Swiss-Prot record:
Pfam families with a match to the protein in the record: Glyco_transf_11 (PF01531)
Tissue specificity field: Brain.
Family note: Belongs to the glycosyltransferase 11 family.
The protein, known as: Galactoside alpha-(1,2)-fucosyltransferase 1
Membrane-spanning intervals of the chain: 13-29
Record's miscellaneous remark: There are two genes (Fut1 and Fut2) which encode galactoside 2-L-fucosyltransferase. They are expressed in a tissue-specific manner with expression restricted to cells of mesodermal or endodermal origin respectively.
Broad class of where this protein is predominantly found: Golgi
Gene from which the chain derives: FUT1
Topology in membrane: Single-pass type II membrane protein
Pathway: Protein modification; protein glycosylation
Side of membrane Lumenal, spans: 30-373
One Gene Ontology biological process: lipid metabolic process
């Protein structure tokens, strides 16, 4: 019998090694199954999809450093801030904008309550998340009543669970983030397009020409007719004021047209002079559904406002020139304790003084009664 050659010995050695390796893997696989584990091979037909990962940056415990263990990532804001929705459309716009600005200023997360979302979301592309009712009920809130102008104390609020109340609507809260506010209050396309279609059909009555400038006019009436004189010793915009405001635009803009909206349209028809053919009574005046009137005003180039937050926001978002009713209360009005004109109207806006003679007469008739009792 011939002794095995060197080649045969090498092949036999390789066969033994292969059998040993296979036996080792087989035992390893059985052990893994016995301990409740399983090996799986990646599917070659498709790439694995990574699951969402939440990264939490823990603070470094070293006293020599204040940095986060996740370099370059700012710490996530803690706590929850919200605001109690109160009042009508313009009030809630002011509350939304103030909440957003103050939360950012203090590094907190802002949430709105469902009622505010229901009021604003059908009109605007707002982005603040909605706070679940259960979370609202179970949270131990610190409540803070805001006055209607920015104060230094509001820039260093430390409560992590804060619920604002009040009716803030001052540009001093949010004007530094104006472009962000304008994005939040972007109209939905169907509202913007409907308003632009209506404006595009307007013609000047005397010439039939297309107007070159659109001036939105908002005339606030309704409950203010009683509230202003009886509670605040003030007035609303009257016929003379509106005439002055419109003449101001006629003197500065060629071929303007005035698009009037109001919650008192009958009064507007009777008191606004439309004989020049440059006035259109376009609003529906429905306070329960303000979207169409508001969309019309914001799509105009300029604004005439009387008083109220609805007119303020229409002017703020429209941009351009704004004429407003100035000094509409008596100097001793309690209203001036909660309202600062310099914080309510932008410095570049133009004020026309109100005629206070009606409320002076009314105030004079009250004066003798102050000394009784």
């Amino acid at each position: 019998m011939w002794p095995p050659s060197r080649r045969q010995l090498c092949l036999a050695f390789l066969l033994v090694c292969a059998l040993s390796a296979f036996s080792f893997l087989l035992h390893l696989h059985q052990d893994l199954f016995r301990n409740g584990l399983a090996l799986s091979l990646p599917c070659l037909e498709r790439q694995p999809v990574p699951a969402p990962v939440a990264i939490v940056c823990l603070p470094v415990t070293s006293p020599a450093s204040n940095a986060s263990s996740c370099a370059g990532r700012p710490a996530a804001p803690s706590g929850i801030w919200t605001i109690h929705p109160d009042g009508r459309f313009g009030n809630q716009m002011g509350q939304y904008a103030t909440l957003l600005a103050l939360a950012q200023l203090n590094g907190r997360r802002a949430f709105i309550l469902p009622a505010m979302h229901a009021a604003l979301a059908p009109v605007f592309r707002i982005t603040l998340p909605v706070l679940a009712p259960e979370v609202n009920r179970r949270t131990s809130w610190k409540q803070l009543l805001l006055h209607d102008w920015m104060s230094e104390e509001y820039s260093r609020l430390e409560d992590p669970f804060l619920k604002f109340t009040g009716f803030p609507c001052s540009w001093t809260f949010f004007h530094h983030v104006r472009e962000q506010i304008r994005r939040e209050f972007t109209l939905h396309d169907h509202l913007r397009e409907e308003a632009q279609r209506l404006l595009g059909k307007l013609r000047l009555g005397r010439t039939g020409a297309r107007p070159r400038t659109f001036v939105g006019v908002h005339v606030r009436r309704g409950d203010y007719l009683q509230v202003m004189p009886q509670r605040w010793k003030g007035v609303v915009g009257d016929r003379a004021y509106l005439q002055q405001a419109m003449d101001w635009f006629r003197a500065r803009h060629e071929a303007p047209i005035f698009v009037v909206t109001s919650n008192g349209m009958k009064w507007c028809w009777e008191n606004i002079d439309a004989s020049r053919g440059d006035v259109v009574f376009a609003g529906n005046g429905l306070e329960s559904s303000p979207a169409k009137d508001f969309a019309l005003l914001t799509q105009c180039n300029h604004t005439v406002m009387t008083i109220g937050t609805f007119g303020f926001w229409a002017a703020y978002l429209a941009g351009g020139d704004t004429v407003y009713l100035a000094n509409f209360t008596l100097p001793d009005s309690e209203f001036l304790k909660i309202f600062k004109p310099e914080a309510a109207f932008l410095p570049e806006w133009v004020g026309i003084n109100a005629d206070l003679s009606p409320v002076r007469t009314l105030s004079g008739s009250w004066r003798p009664w102050r000394f009784l009792g």
